[in-house]
Amino acid sequence: MPAPIRLRELIRTIRTARTQAEEREMIQKECAAIRSSFREEDNTYRCRNVAKLLYMHMLGYPAHFGQLECLKLIASQKFTDKRIGYLGAMLLLDERQDVHLLMTNCIKNDLNHSTQFVQGLALCTLGCMGSSEMCRDLAGEVEKLLKTSNSYLRKKAALCAVHVIRKVPELMEMFLPATKNLLNEKNHGVLHTSVVLLTEMCERSPDMLAHFRKLVPQLVRILKNLIMSGYSPEHDVSGISDPFLQVRILRLLRILGRNDDDSSEAMNDILAQVATNTETSKNVGNAILYETVLTIMDIKSESGLRVLAINILGRFLLNNDKNIRYVALTSLLKTVQTDHNAVQRHRSTIVDCLKDLDVSIKRRAMELSFALVNGNNIRGMMKELLYFLDSCEPEFKADCASGIFLAAEKYAPSKRWHIDTIMRVLTTAGSYVRDDAVPNLIQLITNSVEMHAYTVQRLYKAILGDYSQQPLVQVAAWCIGEYGDLLVSGQCEEEEPIQVTEDEVLDILESVLISNMSTSVTRGYALTAIMKLSTRFTCTVNRIKKVVSIYGSSIDVELQQRAVEYNALFKKYDHMRSALLERMPVMEKVTTNGPSEIVQTNGETEPAPLETKPPPSGPQPTSQANDLLDLLGGNDITPVIPTAPTSKPASAGGELLDLLGDITLTGAPAAAPTPASVPQISQPPFLLDGLSSQPLFNDIAPGIPSITAYSKNGLKIEFTFERSNTNPSVTVITIQASNSTELDMTDFVFQAAVPKTFQLQLLSPSSSVVPAFNTGTITQVIKVLNPQKQQLRMRIKLTYNHKGSAMQDLAEVNNFPPQSWQ
């Protein structure tokens, strides 16, 4: 058989291929020749053939038939054969294949070889793809090589020990004596790998962490020698001595100093020295400074040192490198809650980053800007953020609008400013706001009695001839329906009043009804507003009757139903019309803050009080409001029955802000109303017994498929179902919340509501934190009683904190499998 071609010739031949098919033909031809050579047990050219096979593997072609040949090369006595054999083993084998176990004896022999380069090959292979069984068998040889005087072997053995610890953590103590001595080595390679080994051991074992804290002075001394040493061509990178080792030591110091006063105090001086003496003209210096900042912020450092670290991040914001600006913004966002005042000094620079062309920097700057808002700077920050909202890309508008809403609600200096700000957002980015923006603004307007005339006049002018922003049109329609008499009378004292007639007001609402841009929900708002004006206007009642009667034959079923009901109100119940359509009472907002929630003031000296009038004394009557909700189709709700009463009261109508909906949300068990604040509800037996028994049913009906109820912004909610064969009216729904983003979602609260014909019980969740990268889930159980076997519908509300912002979203679940309710 002729000698096979060399690797270099094969590469040259493959590169001449003009098409993918031609390349595949060449590869297949060569693979056939290599297979033939392997079958003939050709030892002369085995090394050359395996090398060519590895090149084909790098190109993406299958090369698994060369695995056993790699083992034969490893067993060879020639160094060139061993080198290719070990390389092939690292590329073609892994611990999922049993073939790799055949290497154990060869690696053990090579670890005891007389040549350091053969020992190095064995260490590299074990550290790259050694399984837990191999690591357990060969850990003794690795520990022996850690104690050798050969620096070449010690650095490789240290990295191999890291792999052994990851695979078999219980072997960690075996390497403890040898690891201490590694820090006395002068060789930088050994120092670097020893720091990596120490870091791995400290991260995996609290006992090791406490044990190695006594090494902090020695690590500080090594770092100081690196900083103070003169020029060394062997380790110098852009004028800095071994920056890789410096970064590794700083990272280890961060782990050792976390939550430990003595260790933190021992490293304060050296951290200050690194922060002040490191050259920033090169990227290498910036890398060391960044690691220094992370260490300072993570340990119990002095306040002056923390200010120095934040000032370094502030200088990073002025750097021309976008990567440096991005990591600075990310680091400031992590530290803003603990060192808010120091970060506030760089507010103007952070706001300037909103104008950056890079979308990643722009998003981080937006998140950090919202974190800096407090009662002292709310006006200036909102001005900048509103300007940003007006000019930013569409993908930013939803998050920016939500952040402005939350900040305005928390820090608004006055009700008028609050209303103006939200109206500005709705005018600028109304199509991007969350679903709860409309009811929240309606509630705010309702509670601001002195601002009714001003608000309705502003909204009337805002929608003249422009119906593109549907949430704004919905709020305007609601306000015109409630306060249309104030608009016509021109009683506004806040700004120059406008002269509007009753017919002009109705013209606007009729235009909303017939506009092609109006959604079904918006038309519902407009029709209800026209109906309410029948009790506020005196000269246009007949026109209102005519409009309402026209929509009694609308193709929109929801609109038609409302029009028919309103027609019946005119004809049969006209004597009740004034009472049913009277002005909405003040709406109390339910807060869901748990007892352990920490109230953040974002660095303000005193909380900014909102300019409010004292609430009316005495309980508010609710019978008329309930009648109105019944008329509008919003009184068919069943509340969640709490698992245990709490001390937090909740108003009956606080969350029912969208009067056109037929389902509202109710609190989770943590925010359930006390027995004194809600009527007693007759509870079926399944809601009282066996709440903690597992499994929930002993006789489970099989075959109910699970569904994905919600999937948005990295958060996924899945429903799984169980039903009892003996009590088929009961459905147990287990929710599982998972998080695919890079950061945890904290303060997670899941709430649910069902129509009145159902009974619903929401049990306590397993946790309030949804781990990142889908590393865990939150589970929560819902019990639903459906005695009438009606199709199950549910509205869910999700609230959580993510990336420093409070998130909230509503969703309807209508895709329940028939097996779950029939």
From Swiss-Prot:
Pfam families: Adaptin_N, Alpha_adaptinC2. Keywords: Coated pit, Cytoplasm, Cytoplasmic vesicle, Golgi apparatus, Membrane, Protein transport, Transport. It is found in: Golgi apparatus; Cytoplasmic vesicle, Clathrin-coated vesicle membrane; Cytoplasm; Cytoplasm, Perinuclear region. Its main location: Golgi. Changing P765N: Reduces interaction with EPS15 and SYNRG. GO terms for biological process: basolateral protein secretion; intracellular protein transport; melanosome assembly; platelet dense granule organization; vesicle-mediated transport. Coiled coil: none annotated. It comes from the Eukaryota. Widely expressed. Adaptor protein complex 1 (AP-1) is a heterotetramer composed of two large adaptins (gamma-type subunit AP1G1 and beta-type subunit AP1B1), a medium adaptin (mu-type subunit AP1M1 or AP1M2) and a small adaptin (sigma-type subunit AP1S1 or AP1S2 or AP1S3). Interacts (via GAE domain) with RABEP1. Interacts with EPS15. Interacts with SYNRG/gamma-synergin. Interacts (via GAE domain) with AP1AR (via coiled-coil domain). Interacts with CLN3 (via dileucine motif); this interaction facilitates lysosomal targeting. This is AP-1 complex subunit gamma-1.
